[in-house]
């Protein structure tokens, strides 16, 4: 009996090993160098981003600019000579900011100081006359609850918990305080607040307010209150003013509106696999952006890097064994409709996805990748990191893949996310400071090359998950 079980174990191990081809170190290192060399000398990502950012600009879901981006990227993918390029319809929310916002701090009647604000995505407008009220500063949703209706009713709630500067992973710092932005209005309205002001999700002190998605949950329409983000400098000024004068008033006016959903599209292009055409490997970013700035880092960079993966594979003459598909997702910022619809259609059509890679962390220097998979599979992938060491992008770690590819997870595939250096990302994120001139051409190209190299390795040595 022991011999029988030992035999079965040995056969199972041999079958598992046979499913993953033996690595050809010299050939793979040569191909990866060719990919990086090509990206740095004839990559297309920067030129694509220049047009997307400077000729089209911010691409909020449901906007004319978003549809222009759909047409532009579809045309550019068709020009690559891919095996298939098509649009996937998806219904998306339509929120319009309207005329620019205006706000001021009033310490005594007639004595005011203007501060920069921006309406949060999905927020309702103030009245046409604007909104002025006393202010209650809190650092958390818990503190809001502790104060209760008696302290909150009739006031503007000012959420002022900053991002934690000691966290080297700035995305962790963002995650630690973004609940104020997303859920703050819903929570404050339940205690009778008349409006909400949220400190911008930004580690730097500056005058750029940062927008982002917010939710009213299941609040009835007549109980919803306007919500805006204030710049970090403005937040510090408001906090300091309140500490000196609790009677300080805050005024703001915004003109945002929600409209019925409209049709938009995911943009998809692919190279069919030569050996396993039914096994699909996705690489993508989100085509929509906020309407402040031109969305170059979030996520124009991810869009053009993903497109360049297919371009670079063609330029180096590599014919993939599996189908490599670029997906430019619509509506990541305020609904995730594109990612959800892509996963729904994939399931309905019985498509087999084996790997998905997302770039949605800015166009900065690539440091490596995070992988959402089991530990045994990750250890196989981590053994490839030496190939990425010469390009300083060899930090492989377990973690999330990305918001748009997340809905594919039930298929049991390997998910991955490009991890650029994050220290400057939130200087730009969701603000008018996210502009083309802040993207370094070489850093952008290195990211596209690293993604292409990982896709190449996955295509050749896809680990067989247990």
Predicted region positions:
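Bacterial Sec-dependent N-terminal signal peptides
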Residues: 1-22
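N-terminal capping segment at the start of a domain
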Residues: 23, 27-63, 208-212, 216, ...
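Soluble metallo-hydrolase cores and metallopeptidase-like ectodomains found primarily
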Residues: 29-31, 106-108, 114, 118-149, ...
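Second-shell loop/turn segments in exported
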Residues: 32-40, 54-64, 133-137, 169-185, ...
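A conserved hydrophobic secondary-structure block that centers on an alpha-helix together
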Residues: 140-203
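Acidic/histidine-rich catalytic neighborhood of metal-dependent amide-processing enzymes
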Residues: 177, 183, 204, 263-266, ...
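Active-site-adjacent substrate-binding region
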Residues: 189, 195, 199-200, 220, ...
């Amino acid at each position: 009996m022991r011999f029988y079980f030992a035999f079965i174990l040995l056969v199972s191990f041999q079958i598992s090993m046979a499913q993953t081809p033996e690595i050809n170190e010299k050939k793979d290192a040569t191909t990866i160098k060719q990919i990086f060399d090509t990206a740095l000398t004839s990559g297309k990502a920067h030129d694509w981003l220049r047009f997307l950012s400077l000729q089209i600009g911010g691409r909020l879901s449901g906007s004319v600019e978003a549809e222009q981006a759909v047409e532009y990227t579809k045309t550019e993918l068709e020009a690559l000579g891919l095996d298939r390029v098509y649009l996937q319809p998806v219904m998306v929310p339509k929120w319009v900011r309207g005329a620019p916002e205006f706000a001021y701090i009033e310490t005594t009647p007639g004595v005011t100081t203007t501060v920069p604000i921006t309406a949060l995505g999905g927020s309702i407008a103030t009245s046409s006359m604007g909104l002025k009220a006393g202010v209650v500063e809190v650092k958390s949703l818990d503190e809001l609850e502790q104060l209760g209706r008696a302290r909150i009713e009739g006031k503007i709630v000012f959420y002022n918990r900053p991002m934690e500067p000691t966290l080297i992973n700035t995305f962790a710092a963002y995650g630690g305080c973004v609940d104020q932005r997303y859920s703050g209005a819903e929570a404050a309205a339940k205690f009778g607040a008349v409006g909400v002001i949220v400190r911008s999700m930004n580690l730097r002190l500056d005058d750029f307010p940062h927008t982002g998605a917010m939710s009213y949950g299941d609040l009835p329409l007549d109980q919803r209150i306007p919500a805006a983000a204030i710049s970090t400098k403005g937040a510090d000024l408001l906090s300091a003013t309140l500490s000196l004068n609790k009677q300080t008033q805050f005024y703001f006016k915004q003109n945002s509106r929600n409209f019925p959903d409209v049709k938009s599209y995911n943009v998809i292009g692919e190279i069919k696999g030569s050996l396993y055409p039914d096994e699909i490997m996705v690489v993508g970013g989100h085509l929509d952006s906020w309407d402040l700035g031109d969305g170059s880092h979030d996520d124009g960079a991810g869009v053009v890097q993903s497109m360049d993966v297919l371009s670079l594979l063609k330029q180096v003459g590599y014919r993939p064994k599996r189908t490599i598909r670029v997906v430019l997702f619509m509506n990541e910022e305020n609904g995730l409709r594109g990612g959800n619809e892509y996963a729904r259609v994939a399931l309905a059509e019985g498509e087999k996805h084996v790997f998905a890679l997302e770039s949605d962390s800015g166009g900065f220097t690539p440091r490596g990748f995070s992988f959402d998979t089991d530990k045994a599979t990750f250890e196989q992938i981590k053994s490839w990191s030496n190939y990425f060491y010469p390009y300083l992008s060899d930090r492989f770690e377990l973690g999330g893949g990305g918001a748009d590819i997340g809905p594919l997870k039930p298929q049991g595939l390997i998910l991955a996310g490009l991890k650029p250096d994050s220290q400057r990302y939130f200087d730009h994120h969701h603000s008018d400071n996210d502009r083309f001139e802040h993207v370094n051409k070489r850093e952008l190209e290195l990211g596209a090359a690293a993604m292409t190299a990982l896709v190449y390795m996955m295509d050749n040595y896809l680990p067989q998950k247990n």
